[in-house]
């Protein structure tokens, strides 16, 4: 029974995402993207974990590459974007769908939707080696026509220069406790990125 419920739940998540993608171009005609900065994240919670201070400062248009068809995590992502006051879009990919052509297709499409002067995403090595993060980072590097930033990797992020002030750390922790409650394990498992953030210029 649990498997059936889980299957129906995921199908509903896919349907909602697919309908959103179908009608999103219509909303763009009514309300074109004015942001000059675009941020690509692989999954829900990557936004807060890796790009909290960047989002507060730059106010980017945020693109979620993979919803994973999870209604819970989609709801959490929308709540996070509302907290930051950011415009966003999301796409119908499984959380582990690492097909390069699919990822590149999404990124290419989104890059044509605004006149962006700054692009930001994951590093080519996926921060700690996450394959989906890697592929998103590589695709952004390949396709971005403008200045591009990526996350600092695990072997460098622990330095003092990337350590956040205590109020910023507390805010990130509270965002997970209040919004990304399904991902609370992140606070322990990826603690270094809770307390540190860093971006570096992408060299081509």
Where are these regions (language model features)?
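The feature marks non-catalytic terminal segments
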Residues: 118, 147-204
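Active-site beta-strand->loop->alpha-helix modules in alpha/beta enzyme cores, enriched
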Residues: 2-145
């Amino acid at each position: 029974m649990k498997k059936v419920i889980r299957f129906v739940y995921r199908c509903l998540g896919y349907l909602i995402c697919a309908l959103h993608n179908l009608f999103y171009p219509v909303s763009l005609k009514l309300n074109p993207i004015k942001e000059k900065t675009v941020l690509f994240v692989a999954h829900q919670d990557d936004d807060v974990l890796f790009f909290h201070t960047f989002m507060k400062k730059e106010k980017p248009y945020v693109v979620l590459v993979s919803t994973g068809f999870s209604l819970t995590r989609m709801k959490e992502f929308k709540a996070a974007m509302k907290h930051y006051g950011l415009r966003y879009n999301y796409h119908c990919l499984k959380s582990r769908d690492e097909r390069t052509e699919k990822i590149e297709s999404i990124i290419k499409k989104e890059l044509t939707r605004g006149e962006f002067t700054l692009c930001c995403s994951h590093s080519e090595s996926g921060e700690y080696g996450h394959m989906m993060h890697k592929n998103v980072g590589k695709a952004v590097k390949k396709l971005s026509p403008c200045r591009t930033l990526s996350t600092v990797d695990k072997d460098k992020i622990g330095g003092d220069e990337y350590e956040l002030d205590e109020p910023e750390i507390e805010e990130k922790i509270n965002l997970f406790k209040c919004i990304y409650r399904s991902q609370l394990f992140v606070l322990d498992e990826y603690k270094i990125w809770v307390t540190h953030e860093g971006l570096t210029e992408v060299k081509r």
